[in-house]
């Protein structure tokens, strides 16, 4: 029975990963084609293509890691493959967190109806900062990755020089990750999460007040403008829930509370990668350009299937 449940959750994780890879790859291909065609991208498209690319790679790396680790537990735990994975995973995950934060800030300054002078100044200046913020996010993520590598490297150096046993290396490495990394990761990931939370809550509150004002002025729930604001609210709330779930799951995952040997490992991995697999579809259906191309592909697929 336990083996059947494990196989079920592994299959579910595989399907979720394939959907996430396909959706993020779709975003990158569509916006990349536009970039090649026109030689430039709008600030929103810059963030979307960066977010799609980082999520695509993160989902791919995570999927390969999980299945390779499940097949080669002993060799992988004590070898350099684990270090190689963590380098890529920390870099991509940090970049993804920052890109999500800048996406929420851009949504906030473009949509929120706030008349404070500082916000109006930010509304005017922020779109021009987007390329530099994205570049800075990549640089920060690279520095953070080097920091994790610098902290974790001695265990692998001792393994190579003194030829420690696999078990001792694994225990040493696990001790470092259990007692040092969680607090460090909490501090590092809390910065983009705080930026995201402030901007998304400001935007949700602004849209909520605007929707209530429209209803108070006689607009019905069936009014197109009211429906548009309601859809935007639902999309933002979904983004907030998925991002918060991703943040909490990554913090818990950093404590190594659920190991590969745990019965809940595969359900937990589904929770960890849920945001980067599901949120791309929310972005596709809420973006006119992406939704249009996606609808065309569905029509082509339907015509091919009927033929």
UniProtKB/Swiss-Prot annotation:
Residues 29-40, 110-129, 205-234, 286-307 are cytoplasmic. Pfam families: TAS2R (PF05296). This is Taste receptor type 2 member 41. Gene3D superfamilies: Rhodopsin 7-helix transmembrane proteins (1.20.1070.10). It is found in: Membrane. It is a multi-pass membrane protein. GO terms for molecular function: bitter taste receptor activity; G protein-coupled receptor activity. Glycans are attached at residue 167. Most taste cells may be activated by a limited number of bitter compounds; individual taste cells can discriminate among bitter stimuli. It comes from Pan troglodytes (Chimpanzee). Receptor that may play a role in the perception of bitterness and is gustducin-linked. May play a role in sensing the chemical composition of the gastrointestinal content. The activity of this receptor may stimulate alpha gustducin, mediate PLC-beta-2 activation and lead to the gating of TRPM5. Residues 1-7, 62-88, 151-183, 256-264 are extracellular. PANTHER family: TASTE RECEPTOR TYPE 2, TASTE RECEPTOR TYPE 2 MEMBER 41. The gene is TAS2R41. Keywords: G-protein coupled receptor, Glycoprotein, Membrane, Receptor, Sensory transduction, Taste, Transducer, Transmembrane, Transmembrane helix. InterPro entries: TAS2R. The chain crosses the membrane at residues 8-28, 41-61, 89-109, 130-150, 184-204, 235-255, 265-285. One of its GO terms (cellular component) is plasma membrane. Belongs to the G-protein coupled receptor T2R family. Coiled coil: none annotated. It comes from the Eukaryota. Disulfide bonds: none annotated. Its main location: membrane. The keyword Acetylation does not apply.
